[in-house]
Amino acid sequence: MKNAVRDMVERMTGGNTKVAEICASAVADLEEGDVCRRLGEDELRILSEVSNVVHAAGDDTPAEDVMAPFVVSGNLLYTRRNWQYERNVAERIGRMSRNVSAGDVALPDDEFYSLLREEQRKTVAAMCKSQFSILTGGPGTGKTHTVARAVKFLKDANPDLRLALAAPTGKAAARMTESMSNAGVTAAPATTIHSLLGVRYDQVSFRHGRENPLPIDWLIVDEASMIGMPLMSNLLDALHDGCRLTLVGDVDQLASVERGHVFGDLCRMRGVSISRLLESTRFPPDGEIARIAGAVNGNNPAEVMSVLRAESGVVSYVDLSKTSSVAPAGWTGFAEMCRKRFGAFADSGDPKTALDRINDFRILCALRHGPYGVDRLNEFVRKILGRGCPEPMMITQNDRLQDVANGDIGVVMPDDPRRLHLPSVDGTRSIRLECLPATEPAFATTIHKSQGSEFNDVAIVLPPDGVSPLLTREILYTGITRTKGGVRLYASEASVEACCIKAVERVTGLIKPHS
């Protein structure tokens, strides 16, 4: 891609290699999740001389006036498409954020609202007053419970309110449906954002957009940190001018796989209704999981290591830098842990039982390949458990015809190795493996793929050298907070320190200097 862009720009500029290299580098940066490229003064001067390639855009430049393939805004270089996405998100969010109802929201004094903490009551009021709102908080802080109260309040005031629930993945949508139902919300099941928008069979356009907005009055999106800039722009285009939008997520989790850091940027934007829940009921504030998560976010590797080495029973640690082998078989207690933790799942005699036990335990890895990656660990677990047990399989591509989404997990039973069994409203359903686009074993998954999931216990594996660019604050925080019970960390002090000191940084222009 970089070479193709370089060649195109050289043709457009009559062989200007400096301009071609700058533009090609900007495109290459997109692969790292950046929306744009930050320029130095010399680069700005060079690009100012090629208006047919690079359009200099001001804050008021109409998007339709830009024809050049690249855009400079301030000291940032965009592809035209990315500039249009970001401009659209900024304008739509800004306009919606200014639409705030006057007066106070008085919640009824009944049992449905009485158990709300003060921070939750304030959040419900903010959501009910603002056309656009954000709710962020860690696991167990009551985000779903709070949203449910806001929904009830507005539906009581307007019984005809058309509500839609959505999430970036099928797995997250299923969890959202269950959580909202448990919290007392009566609504249609949550769908993936792509399904809500009506992705066309070309996979690049949607049925719903500016010319055909969604017939809803309020959209609530869970796991919003997983939404990239292009999808957020398309989502906003599909909302009519009066539609409410509430984004729910954990700002400390991993950013989207797609380019951008939209949820994180919006959580720092001035003028936006943002509520953050801090009190967790899942993890005691002085408990090991909460202490580690807080220390990771606080860039305090010494505190993380102190908790890990205390070996409380909730948290345990194996120092991979002191093992003699890179193979999992040589890691202290690893094989025994896998046999024990996967034991109940391995003994499942039918698909329903296996699916009920599939989230009892999961191995989470920062890497996909290599001795500390998902591929090697899945191979190892399959070998030690043997051929006679069920195998968890993850779907890795969306398929509308089969109604499956990237990230969905099912099981293959040993007596029926050609079918994948998946959870359904009525229990289970099965699909022949050859009818699915792509699958992979899921005893171990990447931490990225674990977003939106929770497990009774997890083991986290980090490469011990501490130099991988994937070792970030967000990767370790996300992995740790997937558990409802305990964590066993296979890592090293170097890899823990690398995670604590490095936060994900993506170059975007959504937050202006004055925002």
Model-derived features: positions:
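Intrinsically disordered, low-complexity N-terminal extensions of AAA+/P-loop NTPases
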Residues: 1-43
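Interdomain "pre-motor" coupling segment immediately N-terminal to P-loop NTPase/helicase cores
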Residues: 43-104
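N-terminal pre-Walker A segment at the start of P-loop NTPase domains
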Residues: 103-120
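ASCE P-loop NTPase helicase motor core
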Residues: 121-124, 128-312
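Conserved helicase motor core of P-loop NTPases
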Residues: 252-393, 399-402, 413
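Helicase C-terminal subdomain and adjacent C-terminal extension
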Residues: 263, 457-515
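Short, Lys/Arg- and Gly-enriched loop/turn segments at beta-strand edges
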Residues: 400-408, 420, 467-471
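SF2 helicase motor core recognition
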Residues: 401-408, 446-456, 479
